[in-house]
């Protein structure tokens, strides 16, 4: 991992990992390492290494801990855990006159609010979690109901993601059909 990202972005000391292995609100556990890739290609590289080594991967953006999904929960896992913190991969691409966006894994609701302001628009989710730096993905996942139903749906129409196929190999799925280079 260190040879791929550099030691600055691979945290292995307990004190370095603490902020990333404990949610602000909920969840805490041990991780072998916390890695902080800066590009989609670096995320892909890290994922491939983790799949090859058969470690558990927890993808993490803002780590608000609102639902406990971004950190280990306890210490009784059957394999080591690597947390991939995506906050350095935070580009937001505005498309269709501000009606749609492509938000990379670490992009935040606060950043989106700033970008959409140029179009006289605001994000679907502008309550609570926005002020603690929640990611766009987290905002869509956690804030698409309740009081926000009146604003209409917040959802992911198309996505770029990785999955492990039936042969145990990492596979890139690009529903967006936008070409990314590193």
Predicted regions and their residues:
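Structural detector of well-ordered beta-strand residues that form the stable sheet scaffold
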Residues: 58, 102, 124-126
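Extended, alpha-helix-rich binding/interface surfaces that flank or overlap catalytic cores
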Residues: 106
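N-terminal flexible segment immediately upstream of the FAD-binding catalytic core
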Residues: 1-48, 65-100, 128, 142
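Conserved small/polar residues in nucleotide/adenosyl-binding loops
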Residues: 181-182
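Short beta-strand segments
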Residues: 60-61, 85, 137
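A gly/ser-rich beta-alpha-beta helix-loop segment of oxidoreductase catalytic cores
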Residues: 66-67, 71-76, 110, 116-176
């Amino acid at each position: 991992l260190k040879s791929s990202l550099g030691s600055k972005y691979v945290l292995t000391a307990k004190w370095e990992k603490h902020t990333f292995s404990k949610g602000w609100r909920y969840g805490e556990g041990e991780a072998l390492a916390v890695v902080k890739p800066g590009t989609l290609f670096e995320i892909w590289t890290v994922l491939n290494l983790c799949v090859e080594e058969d470690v558990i991967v927890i993808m993490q953006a803002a780590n608000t801990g609102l639902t406990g999904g971004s950190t280990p929960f306890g210490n009784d896992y059957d394999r080591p855990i690597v947390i991939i913190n995506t906050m350095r991969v935070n580009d937001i691409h505005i498309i269709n006159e501000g009606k749609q966006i492509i938000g990379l894994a670490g992009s935040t609701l606060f950043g989106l609010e700033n970008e959409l302001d140029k179009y006289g628009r605001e994000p679907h989710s502008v309550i609570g979690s926005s002020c603690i730096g929640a990611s766009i993905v987290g905002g869509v996942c956690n804030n698409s109901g309740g009081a926000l139903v009146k604003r209409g749906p917040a959802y992911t129409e198309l996505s770029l993601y990785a999955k492990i196929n039936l042969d145990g190999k990492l596979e890139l799925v690009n529903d967006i059909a936008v070409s990314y280079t590193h």
